[in-house]
């Protein structure tokens, strides 16, 4: 993952000394069998390895002379440098990230997945313990007299808008036709594949598209051998980007005389039970998908679900969904740069309970209490021990310039209630004084409520943070025209002219395979 570098800014002074902190971790060996995948995260083994990094500095935003201090006479460059001060330090504090991730395991209760356990559906699950949640599962149109014909191992996932994603497993040979049926019935135009077909000599996803340019038929059968319907899948074009390990396939899907154009993005640079070495190819993938969405015709199909899968459809898939949701929030955020003074937009970016986080000897029990209380309040989770936790708005307003901080440590039950009002949200205020929520913990929690195991490993959770930090660096560089220090894992790929739409990447390093005559895909 590279390293995170920071400039310590304390007590009104700026130190020239740069500390480099390597936050990369050793990857644990996967624990899995032929029929199941381990849902226990790698966090236990990762914690001990990460703990060996020693005590990491936890400088907090309020100790910076720039934080929430619009009267401080600084040039724009210095204001921008201070804008991501807290986020960098939050990522550096491994013990905080570990506690966040641990609390995810405790904050989501058991889910009802009985549909996937039914006898006629078990053969359709790639892993016996990765099943779709009943209340969010994708239900296919039923075929008369065919039991289980509405079942596929997939869930609708709400993100920036309802049903932004369909998260699913890598198709099996006996579910490929159902996969294309799901694509058709939901009018999906984009498929994201975050795995190779095989990894470590194990099949992770069966090929559901033609291997060569041309067409292939996938039929849906009824109760007997009668054909319920036939989907024609034609591979039109393949674009290979070996540098970023991204393959783009343009596919035509035809059913009952109607044809739709589908784009599949396969990212091969993300190994199973692991993370990419750099965020740049992954972020480029996200921008390419955004571009493609904006080009979809008819425009009414631009907000249909994006189908996302890896092998099990939880780890890499959940990490992707988290990053996309955060990117949407960044789009909103950067629109404010033209309308609002930079320091007013950026300074409240990652408001934290400062005093609680300043100590290197952090009380994880107390921190856990804060996190749980925050989630109970923001998500309406019933917590019998916290009936008085209903006044988060007062704390939230502190991020708009106030230096108020919560108590350092709860000493009794009464103090617990006061401290628990602190809402650990990383947010900014837009020009209408509305909070833009950047709470990554909350995003992952909501994803897990819709499909268990999303963002499966601690390393993946940390990768989400690193992706957003690198994206902030890159966008500020492009937007403001000056270089920020300590920009890691960012290459000079195409600079986009605005924050919501990027230009198509150069194909200088790509290989395009297509017929001699090819009409433009819609």
From Swiss-Prot:
One of its GO terms (molecular function) is protein tyrosine phosphatase activity. It is found in: Cytoplasm; Cell membrane. SMART domains: PTPc, PTPc_motif. Its EC number is 3.1.3.48. Residues 327-426 are annotated as: PTPase insert (Asn-rich). PANTHER family: RECEPTOR-TYPE TYROSINE-PROTEIN PHOSPHATASE, TYROSINE-PROTEIN PHOSPHATASE 1. Belongs to the protein-tyrosine phosphatase family. Non-receptor class subfamily. The PTPase domain is interrupted by a PTPase insert which shares no homologies with other PTPase proteins. May have a role in growth and in the early stages of development. Affects the timing of development. This is Tyrosine-protein phosphatase 1.
């Amino acid at each position: 993952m590279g390293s995170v570098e920071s400039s310590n800014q304390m007590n009104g002074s700026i130190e020239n000394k740069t500390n480099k902190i390597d936050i990369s971790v050793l990857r644990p060996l996967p624990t899995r069998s032929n029929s199941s995948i381990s849902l226990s995260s790698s966090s236990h083994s990762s914690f001990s390895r990460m703990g060996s990094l020693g005590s990491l500095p936890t400088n907090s935003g309020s100790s910076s002379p720039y934080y929430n201090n619009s009267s401080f006479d600084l040039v724009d460059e210095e204001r921008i440098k201070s804008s991501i001060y807290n986020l960098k330090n939050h990522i550096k504090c491994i013990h905080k990230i570990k506690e966040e991730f641990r609390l995810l395991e405790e904050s989501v209760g058991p889910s009802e997945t009985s549909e996937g356990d039914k006898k006629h559906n078990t053969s359709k699950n790639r892993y016996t313990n990765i099943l779709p949640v009943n209340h969010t599962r994708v239900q296919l149109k039923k075929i008369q007299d065919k039991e289980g014909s509405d079942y596929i191992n997939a869930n609708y996932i709400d993100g920036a808008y309802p049903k932004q994603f369909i998260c699913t497993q890598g198709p099996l040979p006996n579910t490929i036709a159902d996969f294309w049926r799901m694509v058709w019935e939901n009018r999906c135009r984009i498929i994201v594949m975050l795995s190779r077909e095989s990894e470590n000599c194990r099949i992770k996803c069966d090929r559901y598209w033609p291997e060569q340019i041309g067409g292939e038929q996938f039929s849906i059968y009824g109760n007997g051998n009668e054909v319920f319907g036939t989907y024609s899948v034609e591979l039109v074009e393949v674009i290979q980007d070996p540098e970023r390990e991204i393959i783009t396939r343009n596919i035509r899907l035809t059913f009952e005389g109607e044809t739709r154009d589908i784009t599949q993005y396969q990212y091969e640079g993300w190994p199973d039970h692991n993370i990419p070495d750099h965020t740049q190819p992954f972020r480029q993938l996200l921008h390419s998908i955004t571009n493609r969405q904006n080009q979809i015709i008819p425009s009414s199909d631009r907000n249909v679900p994006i189908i996302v899968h890896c092998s099990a459809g939880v780890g890499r898939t959940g990490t992707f969904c988290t990053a996309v949701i955060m990117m949407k929030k960044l789009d909103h955020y950067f629109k404010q740069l033209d309308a609002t003074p930079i320091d007013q937009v950026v300074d409240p970016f990652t408001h934290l309970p400062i005093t609680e986080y300043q100590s290197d000897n952090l009380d994880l029990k107390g921190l856990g209490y804060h996190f749980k209380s925050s989630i109970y309040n923001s998500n309406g989770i019933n917590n019998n021990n916290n009936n008085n936790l209903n006044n988060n708005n007062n704390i939230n307003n502190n991020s708009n310039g106030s230096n108020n901080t919560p108590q350092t440590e709860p000493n009794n039950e009464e103090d617990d209630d006061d401290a628990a009002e602190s809402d650990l949200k990383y947010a900014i205020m837009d020009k209408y004084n509305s909070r833009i929520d950047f709470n990554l913990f909350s995003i992952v929690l909501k994803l897990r409520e819709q499909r268990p195991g999303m963002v499966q490993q601690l390393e993946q959770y940390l990768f989400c943070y690193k992706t957003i930090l690198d994206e902030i660096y890159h966008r500020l560089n492009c937007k403001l025209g000056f270089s920020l220090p300590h920009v890691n894992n960012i290459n000079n790929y195409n600079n986009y002219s605005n924050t919501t739409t990027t230009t198509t990447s150069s194909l200088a390093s790509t290989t395009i395979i297509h017929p001699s005559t090819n009409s433009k895909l819609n």
